[in-house]
Amino acid sequence: QEDNRMGVDVKISERTLREIYLRGFEIAVKEGQPAAIMSSYNLVNGVHAANSKDLCTRIARKEWGFDGVIMSDWNTTVPEDGSVAWKCAAAGNDIIMPGNAEDAESIRKAYRNGDLTEEEIRSCAGRILKLISQLA
């Protein structure tokens, strides 16, 4: 769906999400071992997918064992819609696209306020550096 793709809120049960919608991604991550994956614009049960620690960290990283880079889709951060850069980083996105000045300030402010930890920032940076070394 392209209409309202940044605002659509998919209301879905955990079972349906896992058995139908995430299954193909799980197979791709486990069998394909991609270096990077991209989070999406839409909301899932009221949370922007790029801001979802459940999707990006708990499922992709911990359950599926994904250790590569997670990046947001282009212009995912739309503060007036509730999707902000620091929440993307806290959820497990390593690269927030396109990486504008507002996104950088959002991350700095969240760090100063204690909403984003140094450990989370270092983890993101580490995965980016690992990807760079793999591609060099």
Q: Where would I find each of the regions flagged by the language model?
A:
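Glycoside hydrolase catalytic-domain context in secreted enzymes
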Residues: 1-136
